[in-house]
């Protein structure tokens, strides 16, 4: 900022501002001045654009006008929310000195820094989404990645081995703010994300990270957390923790542990798969018609967030899955009783985080009290459920009767928003507070008595006693009777139609009342802070209970969904394979106006790949996606939309479904398709579930068919993954005849004249035709174009045998049986008579043939 160059020429107040701003050069500084937060210079210009507020000028300092913008202090949360949503960070600078006793500018300091990844205020957070701060680190061996949800204390790290895995993690976690080292090499991974923060290299130093983490957890080493041998992850975690402490300006007691996330613990899904399956976000970027929109009928925000974490990290531990299944089954008869009580618990998880940060507001404590009041009823209902996992969950929930009693005594039923407004602590909680309040509240009675007495003493019927926030207490007499005011009445204020006076007795009482109000408010703030001190020793138990309540909400929700939507409990088997009887797509069946056609699926070591053919709009993509979604739901422990499901081990789910140009990276549709295909061929295993839809369609027919054939061969013969391979290349239906483990299925349709009816049912065998022209007509392509297309189709189908030796079912020309072209060198040799050549001619022919090869 150029203003710093002439520092001594500025006014004392602007010097104070510039010193504070120099400590936070990269972020906006909200500088408190009375009832406003002001921004100056470049901050003011930036804020006026981001917030659409007026840009003005504040006089001059150092001979230059000062650009200025301001917002009222009481509306600051709304403006902070707008800035945070745009990825901005803000330093909040408050007046901490007393203006009455200050010589020069009032003392100010930055009391907190609001950043997109470290917010905990209820008004700034999306209640049903995690809000993560993340840090990324890279060295020659791979990546380190750490995430922290400061609104819950959940701290995780991982070590993605390659770029694709790192990209998948970024999409899964979708951090609100991402810290990266100043020499980070893979900038294309993170470019375009909001909330990027460039950090110096020393913040990622491994020894500093270990020291930071041990200090936070009160441990000597990190062995107990299972992260000791994760140096790259620890580098990221150390930077992240230091950043969180720097911005919060307080201890973080709710962050008590760190967990290592390992690839082998969950089903891996790359970024393309998460996008294509529309788990929590649809392809248009919204939340409608996603898997979460169907499954998430949780009644608490913390339950909703946990369910979304489960959906994005399906677990592979069948012990955990069977426990969840058992719990869901046991709870199905209890959902109607449990959900109304759980709804009253609210977002206890985030309230506890604000308690730990000492930023909890009075209404947070009132909500906490209300949550505690539900626990006895919840525990009583759960006690009647005959299920060991349910009882284990119940044991994690304390009753906290003492804390409930404390909050019932301490906080009024409906407290104000802020403690500074007063009236938070209940009557009877503190004797001294009650005395000060009685003195302040008794003012009304006193004023009424004084008014009656003075009116009788003076005989002035217009006399009345009142209070004004600016001038304090007064005795008011109309202008017509003011000349009759007693001599001891001292004029305090003149109005148009009246005079206001003060008398020594009233002045003395005013001082007493105002003192009592100030002391009552100061004592109330002290008692409020003491409540934190009484609650915080129980923080660990409270967080454990909040986690158990969130899990109960998820499981009760899944039980309700299973019953309402007619889901069945899947069976886990040890061998490779998926067998589904009458499977349904969980989202499509909810949005269709007509009944959904359920379909079977059978994948096993002897039937690893299904070649799926059929018309456009016939349901191939729906069939493939429903298989992946049923597998995903099974591996979060949920019941699934089918009559019966048996499912074996799955380590990864891959999808190559649809594509669009990646213009920002300069990649065409076909390039995107091939990149995703390469990722599958490199990383899939025999325990992977692979969905391949229309491979090779983005290039020439020969190239596309050849690639599709080779990919199918590789997946079936080399990788041996469980694969659903949808295609319009009818030549691929020959694959089952050429290799084992492959079968043909198709989705049927009926054509009548120019109309087509899609049956949406899966049948064995290959489709007889593609119905492409019928679908085009259905889409509204002009009739003359359809007519010309039919003519061209007949020409192509009747093409000479030299161009296409074989046809598939008489409807599509074969592209695999095109005769190979003869080499020019071979043709020349066939026409050559060696006996007629001279030695010189023979030598010339050798050179000629050499040029033809």
Curated annotation (Swiss-Prot):
Residue spans crossing the bilayer: none
GO cellular component annotations of the record: cytosol
Listed SMART domains: MUTSac (SM00534), MUTSd (SM00533)
Pfam families recorded: MutS_I (PF01624), MutS_II (PF05188), MutS_III (PF05192), MutS_IV (PF05190), MutS_V (PF00488)
GO function term, MF aspect, one: damaged DNA binding
Binding site for ATP: 614-621
Keyword field: ATP-binding, DNA damage, DNA repair, DNA-binding, Nucleotide-binding
GO biological process, one term: mismatch repair
Function field: This protein is involved in the repair of mismatches in DNA. It is possible that it carries out the mismatch recognition step. This protein has a weak ATPase activity.
Family named by the database record: Belongs to the DNA mismatch repair MutS family.
Name this protein carries in UniProt: DNA mismatch repair protein MutS
Native species: Shigella dysenteriae serotype 1 (strain Sd197)
Upper taxonomic lineage: Bacteria, Pseudomonadati, Pseudomonadota, Gammaproteobacteria, Enterobacterales
Gene coding for it: mutS
């Amino acid at each position: 900022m150029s203003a710093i160059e002439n520092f001594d020429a500025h006014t004392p107040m602007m010097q104070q501002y510039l010193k504070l701003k120099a400590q936070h050069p990269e972020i906006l500084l909200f500088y408190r001045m009375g009832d406003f937060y002001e921004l100056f210079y470049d901050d003011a210009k930036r804020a006026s654009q981001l917030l659409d507020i007026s840009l003005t000028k504040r006089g001059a300092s150092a001979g230059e006008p000062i650009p200025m913008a301001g917002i009222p202090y009481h509306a600051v949360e709304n403006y902070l929310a707008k800035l945070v949503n745009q990825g901005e960070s803000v330093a909040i600078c408050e007046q901490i000195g007393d203006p009455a006793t200050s010589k020069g500018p009032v003392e100010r300091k930055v009391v907190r820094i609001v950043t997109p990844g470290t917010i905990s205020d209820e008004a700034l957070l999306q209640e049903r989404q995690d809000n993560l701060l993340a840090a990324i680190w890279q060295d020659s061996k791979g990546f380190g990645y750490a995430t922290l949800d400061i609104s819950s204390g959940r701290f995780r790290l991982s070590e993605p081995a390659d770029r694709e895995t790192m990209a998948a993690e970024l999409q899964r976690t979708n951090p609100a703010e991402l810290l990266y080292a100043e020499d980070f090499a893979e900038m294309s991974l993170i470019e375009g994300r909001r909330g990027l923060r460039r950090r110096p290299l020393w913040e990622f130093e491994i020894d500093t990270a270990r020291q930071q983490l041990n200090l936070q957890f009160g441990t000597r080493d990190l062995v107990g957390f299972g992260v000791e041998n994760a140096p790259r992850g620890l580098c990221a975690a150390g930077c992240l923790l230091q950043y969180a402490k720097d911005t919060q300006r307080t201890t973080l007691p709710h962050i008590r542990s760190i967990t290592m996330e390992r690839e082998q613990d969950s089903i891996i899904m790359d970024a393309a798969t998460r996008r294509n399956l529309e788990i929590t976000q649809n392809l248009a970027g919204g939340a409608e018609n996603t898997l979460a929109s169907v499954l998430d009928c949780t009644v608490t925000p913390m339950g909703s967030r946990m369910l979304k974490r489960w959906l994005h990290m399906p677990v592979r531990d069948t012990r955990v899955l069977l426990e969840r299944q058992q719990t869901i089954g046991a709870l199905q008869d209890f959902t109607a009783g449990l959900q109304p009580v759980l709804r009253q618990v609210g977002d206890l998880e985030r309230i506890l985080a604000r308690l730990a940060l000492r930023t909890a507001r009075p209404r947070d404590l009132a909500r906490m009290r209300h949550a505690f009041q539900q626990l006895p009823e919840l525990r009583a209902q759960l006690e009647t459920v005959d299920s060991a996992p349910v009882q284990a969950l119940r044991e994690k929930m304390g009753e906290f009767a003492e804390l409930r009693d404390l909050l019932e005594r301490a906080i009024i039923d409906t407290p104000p928003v802020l403690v500074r407004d007063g009236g938070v602590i209940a009557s009877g909680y503190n004797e001294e507070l009650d005395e000060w309040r009685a003195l302040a509240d008794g003012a009304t009675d006193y004023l009424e008595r004084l008014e009656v007495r003075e009116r009788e003493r003076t005989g002035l019927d217009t006399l009345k006693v009142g209070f004004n926030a600016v001038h304090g207490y007064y005795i008011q007499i109309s202008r017509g009777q003011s000349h009759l005011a007693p001599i001891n009445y001292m004029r305090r204020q003149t109005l148009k139609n009246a005079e206001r006076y003060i008398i020594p007795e009233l002045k003395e009482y005013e001082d007493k009342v105002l003192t009592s109000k100030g002391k009552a408010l100061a004592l109330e703030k002290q008692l409020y802070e003491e409540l934190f001190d009484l609650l915080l020793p129980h923080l660990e138990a409270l967080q454990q209970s909040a986690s158990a309540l969130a899990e109960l909400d998820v499981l009760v929700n899944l039980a309700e969904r299973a019953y309402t939507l007619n889901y069945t409990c899947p069976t886990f088997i040890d061998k490779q394979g998926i067998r589904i009887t009458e499977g349904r797509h969980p989202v499509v069946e909810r949005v269709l106006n007509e009944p959904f056609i359920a379909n079977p699926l059978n994948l096993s070591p002897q039937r690893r790949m299904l070649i799926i053919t059929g018309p456009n709009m016939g349901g191939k993509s729906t069939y493939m996606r429903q298989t992946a979604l049923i597998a995903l739901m099974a591996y979060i422990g949920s019941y699934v939309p089918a009559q019966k499901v048996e499912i074996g081990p799955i380590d990864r789910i891959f999808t190559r479904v649809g594509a669009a140009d990646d213009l920002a990276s300069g990649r065409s549709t076909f390039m995107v398709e091939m990149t995703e295909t390469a990722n599958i061929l490199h990383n899939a295993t025999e325990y992977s579930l692979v969905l391949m839809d229309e491979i090779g369609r983005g290039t020439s027919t020969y190239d596309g068919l050849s690639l599709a054939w080779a990919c199918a061969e590789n997946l079936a013969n080399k990788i041996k993954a469980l694969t659903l391979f949808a295609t319009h290349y009818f030549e691929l239906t020959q694959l089952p005849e050429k290799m084992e483990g492959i079968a043909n299925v198709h989705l049927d349709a009926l054509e009548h004249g120019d109309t087509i009816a899609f049956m949406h049912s899966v049948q064995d065998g290959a489709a007889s035709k593609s119905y492409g022209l019928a679908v085009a007509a259905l889409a509204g392509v002009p009739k003359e174009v359809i007519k010309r297309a039919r003519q061209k189709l007949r020409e192509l189908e009747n093409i000479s045998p030299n161009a296409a030796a074989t046809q598939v079912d008489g409807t599509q020309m074969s592209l695999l049986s095109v005769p190979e072209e003869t080499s020019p060198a071979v043709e020349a040799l066939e026409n050559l008579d060696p006996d007629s050549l001279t030695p010189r001619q023979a030598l010339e022919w050798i050179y000629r043939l050499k040029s033809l090869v």
